[in-house]
Amino acid sequence: MIKSVTLRSFHLPIEFNDTKFVSRPCFLARSFPVVRCSSTRDVPKLELFSRGKFDRILQDPPLIEKAESELSDYCSTLEGDDSYSCWRAYFELKDLEREKPKVEVENLILQTGGLKSLIGCLHGVASMEKDNKTKNGLHVGEESDREKGMNLHIHIPDGLPKSEQELEEEEKSKMPDSAFTRLLRSKGTIPAWFSHAPDHETD
């Protein structure tokens, strides 16, 4: 930017020499222009104080992304249990973003007053969601087990002799008796807690 400024000459001009000052006779007053240059290239541009909603949406990152970024930066400054709790809240926020609608997550972030309150709020919401999933999972599991039991239950009568195939399978599944086991069977006495099989079950 170029500006033009007019300066007037002195009535008594003074000339400077190495040895003495010499004053010249008075000249007539006359004016001459002086050119001055000023540049505004290095001056930073300030943002407008009143930005529109559309401008903020275009320039600012989404609320959830901004909260995640601030939370990760805050967690990087912590140590120990505080750092663990902060990072757990960060991943809980990620889980909420996947499972819940975007509006609900944004309302949750707006309702909190800061990062510390956001961490506590995320822990509370995550614990409630975990309890609900556990209860619902147990309920569904019990119902499914009951239905499976009703569908797959087959009545097996007791007291019937085993078939030859079942007896062969039992004999094959048994481990071979050691010499000590055979000695106990032949010489040992029956303990008090042992009872013989009823007569109708013996062949």
From Swiss-Prot:
Q: Say yes or no: keyword Aminoacyl-tRNA synthetase present.
A: no
Tell me which stretches of the chain form a coiled coil: none
User: Where in the cell is the protein located?
Assistant: Nucleus; Cytoplasm
**Cellular component annotations (GO), alphabetically ordered:** chloroplast; cytosol; nucleus
Tell me the Gene Ontology biological-process terms attached to this UniProt entry.
cellular response to hypoxia; defense response to fungus; embryo development ending in seed dormancy; pollen tube guidance
Record keywords: Cytoplasm, Nucleus
In the record, what terms sit under GO molecular function? mediator complex binding
Knockout-associated phenotype: Disrupted function of the female gametophyte. Defective in micropylar pollen tube guidance leading to zygotic lethality.
> So what does this one do?
Required for the development of the one-cell zygote and endosperm in embryos. Required for micropylar pollen tube guidance, but has no effect on ovule development and gametophytic cell fate specification. May connect transcription factors and the Pol II machinery to regulate pollen tube attraction, via its interactions with AGAMOUS-like (AGL) transcription factors, MEE14/CCG and the Mediator complex.
What is this protein's name? CCG-binding protein 1
UniProt lists the gene as MEE14
